[in-house]
């Protein structure tokens, strides 16, 4: 859940987001060490007038500063590729939901059900109840079962959009004429907020996404009430 003046990531609520947080910390530590080393060398160069003549043309030094960055890049690339393959893997999804982007709202269709689809519009600020989040509440939430793999099929009917839910590690482009897919799984119940993350016109910032993750029994009751 996001909170005011937040500087870090939202709490991870999916295995993918947990992996992304670990990868972020891993990469940040490497960048921090490299930056510290570079600043230290620069400070030494600026504060001393001595010159080490034997290192002005040394193949050993050139070999080190060629091989070492290559090793560092490999240490960054390997976990990154692992996460990319994890995000692309979809095995036997329990549910498929088709998401269509419009100017400026989202529509959802539960393809495993015969007639379960709806549009999701942002609730205007004037209609919010106490405790509601400004520019993030919608009239129809996407209710999904927790702890089950869900396939999201994402496209657009007009311009480029992007369907993103940060706490679940999701961000997939909605492209007219093309069907993209993403895997969604939540390890806990709750409300998860997102927004369109691709500039799509004057009301781009008024396209919120709200996922309500519930136990399977509650989802079955909700789906029966919607059909």
UniProtKB/Swiss-Prot annotation:
Chain positions recorded as Cu cation A1 binding sites: 161, 196, 200, 207
Broad enzyme group: translocase
Keyword Electron transport: yes
EC number, as in UniProt: 7.1.1.9
Xref: Pfam families: COX2, COX2_TM
Molecular function terms, GO-annotated: copper ion binding; cytochrome-c oxidase activity
Swiss-Prot/TrEMBL cofactor(s): Cu cation
Keyword Transport included in the entry's annotation: yes
Mitochondrial matrix-facing ranges: 46-59
Top-level taxon of origin: Eukaryota
Cross-referenced SUPFAM superfamilies: Cupredoxins (SSF49503), Cytochrome c oxidase subunit II-like, transmembrane region (SSF81464)
Catalytic activity annotation: 4 Fe(II)-[cytochrome c] + O2 + 8 H(+)(in) = 4 Fe(III)-[cytochrome c] + 2 H2O + 4 H(+)(out)
Annotated localization: Mitochondrion inner membrane
Role this protein plays: Component of the cytochrome c oxidase, the last enzyme in the mitochondrial electron transport chain which drives oxidative phosphorylation. The respiratory chain contains 3 multisubunit complexes succinate dehydrogenase (complex II, CII), ubiquinol-cytochrome c oxidoreductase (cytochrome b-c1 complex, complex III, CIII) and cytochrome c oxidase (complex IV, CIV), that cooperate to transfer electrons derived from NADH and succinate to molecular oxygen, creating an electrochemical gradient over the inner membrane that drives transmembrane transport and the ATP synthase.
Protein name (record): Cytochrome c oxidase subunit 2
Species this protein is from: Oryctolagus cuniculus (Rabbit)
Gene, per the UniProt record: MT-CO2
């Amino acid at each position: 859940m996001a909170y005011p003046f937040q500087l870090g990531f939202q709490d991870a609520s999916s295995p993918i987001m947990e992996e992304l947080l670990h990868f972020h910390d891993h990469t940040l530590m490497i960048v921090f060490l490299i930056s510290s080393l570079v600043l230290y060398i620069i400070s030494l160069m600026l504060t001393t007038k001595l010159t080490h003549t034997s290192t002005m043309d040394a193949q050993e030094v050139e070999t080190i500063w060629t091989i070492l960055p290559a090793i560092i890049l490999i240490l960054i690339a390997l976990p990154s590729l692992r996460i990319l393959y994890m995000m692309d893997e979809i095995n036997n999804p329990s549910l498929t939901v088709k998401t269509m982007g419009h100017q400026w709202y989202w529509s959802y269709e539960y393809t495993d059900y015969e007639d379960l689809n709806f549009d999701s519009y942002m609730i205007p600020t004037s209609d919010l109840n106490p405790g509601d989040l400004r520019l993030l509440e919608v009239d129809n939430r996407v209710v999904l079962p927790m702890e089950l793999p869900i396939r999201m099929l994402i496209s657009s009917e007009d311009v480029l959009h992007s369907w993103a839910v940060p706490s679940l590690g999701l961000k997939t482009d909605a492209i007219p004429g093309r069907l993209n897919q993403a895997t969604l799984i939540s390890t806990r119940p709750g409300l998860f907020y997102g927004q369109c993350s691709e500039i799509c016109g004057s009301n781009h910032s008024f396209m919120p996404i709200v996922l309500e993750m519930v136990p399977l029994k509650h989802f079955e009751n909700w789906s029966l009430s919607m059909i």
